[in-house]
Amino acid sequence: MENQTRQYSNEELRARFNPEGSQLWKHQQRMVELLLAFDAICKRHHIRYWLIGGTLIGAARHQGFIPWDDDMDVQMLREDYLKMIEILPRELDETMALQCRQTDENYFFQYAKLRDRRSVLDENNGYDRIFKERGIYIDIFPIDKHPKWLQRLSMQT
């Protein structure tokens, strides 16, 4: 018997995993709003960033989200990250908040989150409830430059 696989279209995947109006669909729409606000501020202040992980795959493969994806990830160089942490809290409207170690004394991650203040996520991870902000979010990861010798070494392994 021959093993056959079926290719699903983006529309079929969205209809199956994330129909318009579903909770996940609404969640994704709010993340897009967060990203658009983030993008506008970053452009205004010449802060560079890029999409990573499933967010990048979704943009390239699905022209949006991976249908079942419930988060969004961006990354930037450390120098841009530090600039962003200074600027973003002053420029966000009242429906959004930057959550990082500088803005939430209970937050312990080494990366920031741009949070929606009009929603509450129950992530069931045991620690989210201690954070000041708990809404829908975008993860913002800093990346550090490495010396050339370390880059060459990592390419050899």
Language model: regions and residue ranges:
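Conserved catalytic core of two-metal-ion nucleotidyltransferases
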Residues: 9-43, 88-148
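Active-site nucleotide-donor binding segment shared across nucleotidyl transfer reactions
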Residues: 39-72, 81
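Short, conserved charged micro-motifs
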Residues: 82-86
